[in-house]
Every structure is written in structure tokens, then in C-alpha cells.
Swiss-Prot record:
Protein name in the entry: Purine nucleoside phosphorylase DeoD-type
Similarity comment: Belongs to the PNP/UDP phosphorylase family.
Keywords: Glycosyltransferase, Transferase
Domain of life per record: Bacteria
Catalytic center residues: 204 (proton donor)
Binding positions (phosphate): 20, 24, 43, 87-90
Organism: Actinobacillus succinogenes (strain ATCC 55618 / DSM 22257 / CCUG 43843 / 130Z)
Gene Ontology CC annotations of this record: cytosol
Catalytic reaction(s) noted: a purine D-ribonucleoside + phosphate = a purine nucleobase + alpha-D-ribose 1-phosphate; a purine 2'-deoxy-D-ribonucleoside + phosphate = a purine nucleobase + 2-deoxy-alpha-D-ribose 1-phosphate
Amino acid sequence: MTPHINAPAGAFADVVLMPGDPLRAKYIAETFLDQPELVTDVRNMLGYTGSYKGRRISVMGHGMGIPSCSIYSKELITEYGVKKIIRVGSCGAVRQDVHVRDVIIGLGACTDSKVNRIRFRDNDFAAIADFGMAQAAVQAAKNKKIKVHVGNLFSADLFYTPDVEMFDVMEKYGILGVEMEAAGIYGVAAEFGAKALSICTVSDHIRSGEQTSSEERQTTFNEMIEIALESVLLGDND
């Protein structure tokens, strides 16, 4: 057990899907996993372990922002032996060719957070996904005929940013989605010898104002989940 996870040793699979919302973790477990078992509920940050097509897999919420997701991902890796983390979350879009409900596979994550600089002795750290995991996710999407965007995310520290002109810079640099966790999870995985990938569904468009409801974010976005789960099976076959 840890201060934030009350699961016993061995309760988690070596691969954990991590949405931000613990209710989305509950939905994923109950909808996609066979015989899901609740293994942790500290602070109502729900975590489950079950199986998908016979493969043992866990799912657990990580909360909002880099500080929260860094705590949970670090403890899963160092205390529970987790080898791979797949963030399955929502993001905002700034580009006109990226639409609400589109799926993004985050090869890398820019950020305005200093957490990776703190880890990396004040040097820039290239927060990137594991190539094999990204490759498997792209292949899983192709197999299911799901269109995906593949490229950079931006992990922001502020949800309500005062620097709205930064969205113009993001669009210029080809940022596909704006969220709050990927860069932190990639940094934690690198520091502690694990692998990570972020797959996001566009929940709102920052330019057009189009958005999904909180209920939709909890109980839909199934294509992203299917890609993540199928990518685990493909990764096992490599």
C-alpha cells in the first residue's frame, strides 16, 4: 500500500489504462473488462483489475493535472511493478483539421510545467511516448478502421489560462491537442524505467467552442478505449 493507493501487492496488472476521471475508470472496467475487481478507492480514485480477451489489465483514474497523475503513475510503477501506462483522456483542439471526438495518439508532449525540468536538472527533457506502444496503437486503429491523428500534445498547468495568444503559437507548431497530464506521465515513466503512451479524444474545440458534456466524457469515447486495449494485445505479440 501507499499513501494514495490501498491495493495489496500484486493487485495491478503490468499494464494500466489511466483516465483522469475515476468514474471513467469505473465505466471502462465495467464495460470492457471481464470480471473487474475494485482494488483501490482511496480518495475515490478508483482502480480496477480484470481481463480483456484473456489478458490481465488494470484501469485507474489519475485525477487532473501533472501533480496528481505523477503521484499515481509513480506509485504504480515503483510500488506495484507496473511496466506500461496508457493515458486515455480528453483534450481540447486548436487546429481546424482536428475535430470534436477525433482520436489523437500523442507521440510527444510539450508543456509549460516545470516538473520535467526539475527532474532533469533544469535542462529540457523530450517528453515522448514509447515507440513500440505508439506503433501498436496506430496499428490497432488501422485494424479497427478508426481515423487517428498522430503527433504532439501540449500539457498545460492552467486550465483557465490567461495567455490565450498561446493557442495561436500551438496551432502554428502543429499541436494536435491541449490537455494537462501527458508530459508528466512521460517524464515519470522515463525516470523510473517504465513505458507510457497517451491517447486522447477531443472533447472540445478551443476555436469553435464546440464541446461534449461531462456525461459524454465519462461514458463514451469508446474508440479511444478500444484502441488502447487492442494495442496492449498487439504489443504482447511483438
